[in-house]
Amino acid sequence: LNAALLFLFNSQQIEATAYLQHMESVAKAFVFDRFLAENVGADYFDIIYTNGGVCQTKRHNQNQSIMVNALKPRLTFGHIANNLVFNFLDYLLWINHRAAEPIKSYEFTFRSSVEHYYPQNPSGSNMRIEPDTLNSFGNLCLISHEKNSRLSNRLPQEKKGFYQDNSPDSVKQHLMMQFATWDAQAIDEHGKAMVAVLIDCLDAAPHC
């Protein structure tokens, strides 16, 4: 809110495109300069006032695998500093997939629970999967607390069946449900694709 008000206060003429581009830049800075920072994350004051809401994390010519390995520990369940990481990724995915349903009619809502798509404690006699895979970014998505409580121990196919009659809670979740089989290979594939989307946005022009 502070970043938004500062931009509006300093603008002689308020233009929607410029405002949206600035807020996208601020969100990117929050994600990369603070929540996914390798060392101590930047203060909000520095991001908003010192850096003017401009993301200081640059991709430059860094090797993709080096960046992926650097981000991996901070994209693991229990170590993701803020849910804005999921929300910002959903925004990027929405930009890429908004021409097709159901993303075309998707609406961002408040979601506060990080869900394991393959459950931590699967119901019945179903097999558990290896913890590093279970807790990796590829197996995680953001959903409402109510649905997480209701579906937490259900298997992916059961969850997919539930959402056939309900709107997805997140764009990332929708993409996860497109896999015919949700196993370690699918989790790894999806996780790599999602991290690539995050890294690629460092080079991208504003989407607004």
Where do the PLM segments sit?
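Flexible coil/loop and intrinsically disordered segments
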Residues: 1-208
